[in-house]
């Protein structure tokens, strides 16, 4: 990717460093005395590379696994005049998350949070021997029937948020991190939302220097 670039390796590495600490493209252009369009090009290339890297990860999640869904955006459907509900009845975009304790996180944009939809993602990403923790949403019904014999729920509806190891605090921490990070972009178009989501997944619990080294290796 970098062989045909007019920029030196030094400059590209500087752009990567700025990208990995979430410096906006406009500020990076000023800091490095480069054209804004040049920075936009590299930032988009980085996001496409990260997206491909994250979606190509094949190893299934194993161990203690937390699953949860979250909702992003504030879009209204044209012609809809009622109040927007919160959570699972909302018009916002649902995103499903899988969190491996002390390990990786995986996110996927889903059309809904029905049982069939969530089970398809879980079956594709989580090993059967794993211990799965979820809240009480009915979309998680039936996991035992498809082979996940160790499925435990925390009942948020009864103000229960943890019972020993039975909690989903890890994935909820990721959602908070994700929404704080994405808010810095002051609005992301639907076209690019998935790229930013995977970038945030890639960022989770990692130091900028580690990210910069990996990104440099990915684009070489």
Question: Where are the regions a protein language model picked out?
Answer:
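Residue-level recognition of single "structural anchor" positions
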Residues: 1-220
